[in-house]
From Swiss-Prot, chains A, B:
Record protein name field: Ureidoglycolate lyase
Gene Ontology terms describing biological process: allantoin catabolic process; purine nucleobase catabolic process
Source organism per UniProt: Rhodobacter capsulatus (strain ATCC BAA-309 / NBRC 16581 / SB1003)
Summary of subunit composition and partner proteins: Homodimer.
Cross-referenced Gene3D superfamilies: Ureidoglycolate hydrolase
Cofactor(s) essential for the protein: Ni(2+)
Entry's EC annotation: 4.3.2.3
Keywords assigned: Lyase, Purine metabolism
Catalytic reactions of this protein: (S)-ureidoglycolate = urea + glyoxylate
CDD domains registered for this protein in UniProt: cupin_UAH
Length: 161, 161
């Protein structure tokens, strides 16, 4: 099985695939009498005209490392953000697209409390909490129509830390 | 100072003011080869035509109980959801409206990992993490125009557990 090494998750490294949702610098502004910093509009949410943003909750079972990546999926009609409610780190596998085929895979692991937003139509592995089960708020598209494409990997990848 | 007692946070009790975002029953469907339950579209997101949903991050200082509630605010152009990334419970004070004046105050305290969505134009206290500072993903309205009304309480309330 081919190996895929986990690399450091930075906003720059992840930018082609989506957005890192975390405190990454000073706040855009202080609110609530200076007791709270607002880091404004951190994710490129993107939905088709028939869709809208919604908040759902994924209650996901634990996975372990090394992790066998045997399938990726994408959502042509909308972006998808994952926001951990239990502080459980999760694996984020993504890939570029070549005429409908995922290529040049990358793997990242969030730190506790970090969220990510995956761009509309970007190939990604399914939610994979590492080491413990976890609840995740998910901001994605609510609406009619087919918003899921799956691609089973002919040769699975072994994702390692 | 008048006292306001914290009451149990249930979806029913909070419904007039917003939505409780948590695992509250069986999932709407199982996804990811049965390894994840999806609890679908849990929040009444509501934005005016010029606004859209965005994900921001609030980095808020700790508060303590009892808590002095001396101001509430509301957002006429959009709902506002708070999703804890560090598992820090937070105080949720809300009130009904009587011709622009907040009345009949209520106070709730989330459990670790619970989020809430506050309905558009509903009076509420500012984000108040209890016992520790915390980061919260906030799904609220991004757009032009005035979306904040504040109401300083003539007589503050002492919120107690």
């Amino acid at each position: 099985m081919e190996r895929l090494m986990i690399e450091p998750l930075t906003a720059e490294a992840f930018a082609p695939f989506g957005d890192l949702i975390d405190v990454l610098g000073p706040p855009d502004r202080l609110i609530n009498a200076g007791l709270c910093g607002r880091h404004h509009d951190l994710a490129r949410l993107d939905f088709d005209a028939e869709g809208r943003a919604g908040i759902s909750l994924f209650d996901a079972q634990a996975r372990t490392l090394p992790h066998v990546l045997d399938l990726v999926e994408r959502h042509p009609l909308g972006s998808q953000a994952f926001l951990p409610l239990d502080g459980v780190p999760f694996l984020v596998c993504v890939a570029e697209d070549a005429d409908g085929v995922p290529v040049r895979f990358r793997a990242f692991l969030t730190a506790p409390g970090q969220g990510v937003n995956i761009l509309r139509n970007c190939w990604h592995g399914v939610l994979a909490p590492i080491g413990a089960p976890g609840r995740y708020a998910v901001v994605d598209r609510i609406g009619p129509g087919a918003n899921l494409q799956e691609y089973p990997l002919p040769v699975p990848l072994l994702v390692e830390g």
